[in-house]
Each structure stands twice: as C-alpha cells, then as structure tokens.
C-alpha cells in the first residue's frame, strides 16, 4: 500500500496586507474585478460582447469607476465625470458611474480595457485599470485617492429611463 506522509495545513500563500488591514472611515478602498464579458481583455476585440450591456451598470464599450451614490455625493462627482484614481506610485484616469447598491467607500474598476495592442474593434475602448495593480495588490487596495476633474467622458448606457418612471430606488439596510 502507501507509506505514511506528513501533511501541513499551513499554506505558503500569504494574504495581501491590504485585506488584513481595516480601512478608516474616510479612507477609500479599490476593488479590481475582471469584466464580466471581456474578462481580462482577451475578448476585447469581439464587437458582440462590447455591445452587450454589463449586468448591473448597463454600460457598453467601456469601463468606469463604479461608486455608490453616498460616495459620489461625498466626493462631489457625477456620472461621466473624469477622476484620477491614485495609489502610491500608480494612477489611472477613469469616468465615474454611480451604482445604487455599491458599497460605500469602495471604488470598483473592471479590468480588460485600455489595451495598447488590439484589433480594430477594441482599439480605444476604456481605460487601463491594470495600471493600478501590483503583485501584492492584485484584486484590491486601501488608501485610494480620488481626484476629480471637470472633464467628462460620455459613456454608452442601454438603460432608457434612469429614474425608472419616477419610482424611488430600492433601499436596503
């Protein structure tokens, strides 16, 4: 049969320091996620996927800095307003998209856009959120600084009625 083997339950993988450190009340957190359709950018040159609305935001052809209504009010920003997302030693310029249900104090950006080498379809689509990543901050970081500008970048959204016929947004506790 088989010989005895000694097994350790300790993993050699370390959790990045940002996920172990609680953020302060005024500190913003960055969450990096793959785009639900073009993933890490490998499908950025597929026009059908670009035209498909993203599940929550209904955005097409672009990525944006997703923030909650309360965070947008606190920062004084509006939809389509450009902001600089800055972490120590790295930054990216992104348009804002306000998303009800997004966690307060968290800015989510989707990866896969802003590629320099792509085909005709994907050229010029979105911003490079990968510029905010490091090997220790692959999926998120705390200490994000958001610097607003007065420039705007139009975003394509397939939602016809932003207020949904004057109905108030669904509130949750």
Describe every region a protein language model picked out.
Residues 1-173:
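A cross-kingdom feature strongest in bacterial/archaeal respiratory oxidoreductases
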């Amino acid at each position: 049969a088989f010989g005895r083997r000694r097994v350790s339950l300790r993993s050699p993988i370390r959790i990045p320091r940002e996920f172990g450190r609680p953020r302060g009340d005024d500190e913003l957190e960055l969450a990096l996620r793959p785009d639900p359709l073009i993933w890490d950018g490998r499908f950025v040159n597929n026009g059908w996927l670009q035209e498909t609305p993203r599940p929550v935001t209904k955005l097409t052809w672009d990525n944006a800095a997703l923030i909650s209504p309360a965070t947008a009010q606190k920062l004084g920003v509006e939809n389509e307003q450009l902001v600089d997302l800055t972490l120590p030693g790295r930054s990216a310029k992104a348009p804002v998209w306000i998303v009800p249900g997004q966690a307060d104090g968290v800015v989510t950006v989707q990866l896969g856009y802003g590629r320099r080498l792509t085909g005709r379809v994907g050229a010029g689509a979105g911003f490079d959120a990968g510029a905010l990543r490091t090997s220790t901050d692959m999926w998120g970081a705390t200490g994000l600084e958001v610097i607003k500008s007065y420039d705007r970048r139009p975003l394509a959204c397939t939602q016809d009625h932003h207020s949904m016929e004057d109905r108030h947004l669904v509130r949750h506790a």
